[in-house]
Regions:
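Nudix hydrolase/Nudix homology domain
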Residues: 27, 31, 98-134
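Short secondary-structure boundary/capping segments
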Residues: 10, 25-26, 76, 96-99
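Residues that flank catalytic or metal-binding motifs in active/ligand-binding sites
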Residues: 4-6, 32, 82, 101
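Active-site-adjacent beta-strand/loop module that shapes the phosphate/pyrophosphate-binding cleft
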Residues: 3-4, 14-16, 72-96, 106, ...
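Short histidine/acidic/glycine/proline-rich micro-motifs that form metal-
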Residues: 40-42, 75-76, 112-114
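Conserved N-terminal beta-strand and adjoining loop/helix that marks the start
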Residues: 1-19, 37-40
Length: 134
């Protein structure tokens, strides 16, 4: 299978917040911007396995396949790769997670998430999430 991107976010339905990742300035792709946790597939992974691995690497937490909800998937023409986006319902506190990559991460209220410096694909996919939630 060709390399693909798999990523996503945690969502707390009680507080209506999403957990997003702030990229550091060492990356060539969207430095210092907020986006989803995730990355490129490795070996023979399927998308959900890539998402689980990336969350483990970036937040230090384990997800079960059954907790993961597919949001959307499509061809990212700009990068010529398929993009799979997932989310997980969670009320985990920030203190229970450990940043493994990037500059920061935080719970952000949906009411003002679009005031953050988000990557273009994060904006598009969060809009899809909001359309499906309402």
């Amino acid at each position: 299978m060709k390399t693909f991107f798999a990523g996503g976010f945690l969502y707390n339905p009680k507080t209506k917040e999403v957990l997003l990742h702030k990229r550091d300035d060492k990356t060539d792709v969207n430095p210092n911007m907020w986006g989803f946790f995730g990355g490129s597939s490795e070996n023979d992974e399927i998308p959900i396995q890539t998402f689980i691995r990336e969350i483990r690497e970036e937040l230090g937490i384990e997800l079960s396949e059954g907790s993961i909800i597919p949001l959307c998937d499509y061809l990212n023409v700009k990068r010529d790769t398929h993009r799979y986006v997932f989310y997980v319902l969670s009320n985990k506190k920030k203190e229970e997670m450990v940043l493994g990559e990037g500059a920061d991460f935080d719970w952000i209220p949906l009411a003002n998430v679009f005031s953050y410096d988000l990557t273009t694909k994060t904006v598009d996919d969060l809009r899809t999430f909001l359309e499906k939630k309402t």
